[in-house]
Amino acid sequence: MSKRYAVVLAAGQGTRMKSKLYKVLHPVCGKPMVEHVVDQISTLNVDKVVTIVGHGAEKVQEHLAGKSEFVKQEEQLGTAHAVLQAKAELAGKDGVTLVVCGDTPLIEASTMEALLKYHHEKRAKATILTTVIEDPTGYGRIIRDDLGIVEKIVEHKDATEKEQRISEINTGTYCFDNKALFEALENVSNDNVQGEYYLPDVIKILKDSDEVVAAYRMESFEESLGVNDRIALAEASKLMQRRINENHMRNGVTLVNPESTYIDIDVKIGQDTVIEPGVMLRGKTVIGDDCVVTSGSEIVNSVIGERVHVRTSSIFESKVGDDVQIGPYAHLRPESDIHDNVKIGNYVETKKAVVGEGTKLPHFIYMGDAEIGKNVNVGCGSIAVNYDGKNKAKTIIGDNVFVGCNSNLIAPVKVGDRAFIAAGSTITKDVPDDALGIARAKQDNKLGYAKHLNHGK
């Protein structure tokens, strides 16, 4: 098999986005659009990927580190000029080169593989990826002769009335014989209104040299959707989300209302898990089998075990074991590690907390910088007081401990195994194993005193 190369065009400034963020770094379902493109290319056994960068080059290189080589286009002088910047890396090499736009996040590896195969079958020097759309206004048209052979690409503004009625368009993705590409690029002129060097002119140069130019027509226009403004970004995100959600449903996940469920592309979900409407699953979240995530929940970069029930709660950068009940309205902040068979109830917040197997935090609890053992019960209103205004400190609770309601554990403090903390206590010293910790003022009843108080009656 001949060598394969790819050039990704990612140097455009994207002024229509009206954003400080470099255009191709705008995310589509949790991943920058240019990274979608490069990740798809990486599955094609490509020998080298060269990304042409311009504005925001450093940020693009950060995101694609290890996935691509980079060449900077100092001046944005058109698509042909952009590809020519890869001359030092690719010119003179045998093989074929894919040219793909970095702002087409929906393009799939299977389509590019089909393009490469068609290019090889036709023994072409260039093959254009095309598609047919109802309204081709603004797109370059593919002009074929009576035998269906490609004659040229005509830009919309230069097309005759007859040519404007053609619905087959140039998607901006190409496959070239690598040597022929770079030889032709040297002859591209900028004799046009914009004074730029355009890649479609390579097609004309090759045709004028009697080289074979082919066109592979793909089924779906959506793969070629280029993102140039926020409206197109929203459309691309919508189409990508539908693709992601349908893939999860095909793999055994129930999405009660897919249209209102947001799932990033790197999220993994196990079979027979049910995701209710209004759920957001972000980053590299992994959810096991047989879970339920109810409406209003957000889970970000977290690992969730099997048979977990998350009720209208937020989980960030945390780990949850099997058979755990969470919520409603719980908040697991980063570095929470919740073991199996734990109950995290309503209005419970954890942060940098390890919660041992079988432990119950039923409601209105804060546990930050805490290590909690197995089979512990923490009463309503209890707090691990971890911050003294300058420093954070740790609370350690052993196994089989009972913490009464409205208890304050002033860190650093350790509560031993099987200890009992009396309700309303403020614990400032360690509590030994099997001990009762109690720290509250003695109750004093003032008999008859209430008669002197004004109760408003």
Curated annotation (Swiss-Prot):
Binding positions for UDP-N-acetyl-alpha-D-glucosamine per the UniProt entry: 9-12, 23, 73, 78-79, 140, 155, 170, 228, 333, 351, 366, 377
Keyword field contains Transcription: no
One of the record's GO molecular function terms: UDP-N-acetylglucosamine diphosphorylase activity
Gene Ontology cellular component terms for the protein in this record: cytoplasm; membrane
Residue numbers spanned by region N-acetyltransferase: 252-457
Enzyme class: transferase
Residues the record marks as active site: 363 (proton acceptor)
Span list, region Pyrophosphorylase: 1-230
Matching InterPro entries: Bifunctional_GlmU, GlmU-like, GlmU_C_LbH, Hexapep, Hexapep_transf_CS, NTP_transferase_dom, Nucleotide-diphossugar_trans, Trimer_LpxA-like_sf
Catalytic reaction list: alpha-D-glucosamine 1-phosphate + acetyl-CoA = N-acetyl-alpha-D-glucosamine 1-phosphate + CoA + H(+); N-acetyl-alpha-D-glucosamine 1-phosphate + UTP + H(+) = UDP-N-acetyl-alpha-D-glucosamine + diphosphate
Cofactor(s) named in the record: Mg(2+)
Primary location: cytoplasm
Cofactor binding description: Binds 1 Mg(2+) ion per subunit.
EC number: 2.7.7.23, 2.3.1.157
Pathway linked to the protein: Nucleotide-sugar biosynthesis; UDP-N-acetyl-alpha-D-glucosamine biosynthesis; N-acetyl-alpha-D-glucosamine 1-phosphate from alpha-D-glucosamine 6-phosphate (route II): step 2/2; Nucleotide-sugar biosynthesis; UDP-N-acetyl-alpha-D-glucosamine biosynthesis; UDP-N-acetyl-alpha-D-glucosamine from N-acetyl-alpha-D-glucosamine 1-phosphate: step 1/1; Bacterial outer membrane biogenesis; LPS lipid A biosynthesis
Binding site for Mg(2+): 103, 228
Subcellular location: Cytoplasm
Stretches the record annotates as Linker: 231-251
Matches recorded under PROSITE patterns: HEXAPEP_TRANSFERASES
Subunit text: Homotrimer.
Family of this protein: In the N-terminal section; belongs to the N-acetylglucosamine-1-phosphate uridyltransferase family. In the C-terminal section; belongs to the transferase hexapeptide repeat family.
UniProt cross-references to PANTHER family, sorted A to Z: BIFUNCTIONAL PROTEIN GLMU, NUCLEOTIDYL TRANSFERASE
Purpose of the protein: Catalyzes the last two sequential reactions in the de novo biosynthetic pathway for UDP-N-acetylglucosamine (UDP-GlcNAc). The C-terminal domain catalyzes the transfer of acetyl group from acetyl coenzyme A to glucosamine-1-phosphate (GlcN-1-P) to produce N-acetylglucosamine-1-phosphate (GlcNAc-1-P), which is converted into UDP-GlcNAc by the transfer of uridine 5-monophosphate (from uridine 5-triphosphate), a reaction catalyzed by the N-terminal domain.
UniProt protein name: Bifunctional protein GlmU
Organism: Listeria monocytogenes serotype 4a (strain HCC23)
